């Protein structure tokens, strides 16, 4: 009986920790103001769960850093936006995550807000695939 309980606990632990932060395929909308439309492209980004906690008693000396699923490494890829005006720059570079980890959110390169615009937001009504 103890062996069965051990295996149940082990698989529950594995399901929680191993299915955490990982690369995920997403579709994002890219746009340029000069082109006046959006296109959808596929890329990879980090998504998942990280072990975190919110302390009941806040300690002003020790900051409470929440861990989030974020990129560890990424590269930029470039796409040519079709239909732009001749004088407009039609090249658009976007990030592609290559590795993920649980860490603090880097506000210099990432939208860390709870209610961001989202990857499919488009300023223009017309969208091209």
Swiss-Prot record:
Pfam families from the UniProt entry: Cys_knot
SUPFAM superfamilies: Cystine-knot cytokines
Keywords: Disulfide bond, Glycoprotein, Hormone, Secreted, Signal
Lineage top rank: taxon: Eukaryota
GO molecular function, one term: follicle-stimulating hormone activity
Glycosylation sites: 25, 42
Gene3D superfamilies tied to this protein: Cystine-knot cytokines
GO biological process: follicle-stimulating hormone signaling pathway; G protein-coupled receptor signaling pathway; regulation of signaling receptor activity
Segments passing through the bilayer: none
UniProt main location, coarse: secreted
InterPro entries: Cystine-knot_cytokine, Glyco_hormone_CN, Gonadotropin_bsu, Gonadotropin_bsu_CS
GO cellular component, as recorded: cytoplasm; extracellular space; follicle-stimulating hormone complex
Cysteine disulfide links: 21-69, 35-84, 38-122, 46-100, 50-102, 105-112
Range of residues in the leader sequence: 1-20
Location in the cell: Secreted
Family: Belongs to the glycoprotein hormones subunit beta family.
Known partners and oligomeric status: Heterodimer. The active follitropin is a heterodimer composed of an alpha chain/CGA shared with other hormones and a unique beta chain/FSHB shown here.
Task performed by this protein: Together with the alpha chain CGA constitutes follitropin, the follicle-stimulating hormone, and provides its biological specificity to the hormone heterodimer. Binds FSHR, a G protein-coupled receptor, on target cells to activate downstream signaling pathways. Follitropin is involved in follicle development and spermatogenesis in reproductive organs.
Name recorded for this polypeptide: Follitropin subunit beta
Organism: Trichosurus vulpecula
Organism taxonomic ancestry: Eukaryota, Metazoa, Chordata, Craniata, Vertebrata
């Amino acid at each position: 009986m103890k062996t069965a309980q051990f295996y149940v606990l082990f698989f529950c632990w594995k399901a929680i920790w191993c299915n955490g932060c990982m690369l995920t395929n997403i579709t994002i909308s890219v746009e340029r103001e000069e082109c006046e439309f959006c296109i959808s492209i596929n890329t990879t980004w980090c998504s998942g769960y990280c072990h975190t906690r919110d302390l009941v008693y806040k300690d002003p000396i020790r900051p409470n850093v929440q861990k989030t699923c974020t990129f560890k490494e990424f590269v930029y890829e470039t796409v040519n936006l079709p239909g732009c005006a001749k004088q407009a720059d039609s090249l658009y570079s976007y990030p592609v995550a290559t590795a993920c980890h649980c860490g603090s959110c880097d506000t210099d390169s990432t939208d860390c807000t709870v209610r961001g615009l989202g990857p499919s937001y488009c300023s223009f009504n017309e969208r091209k695939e």
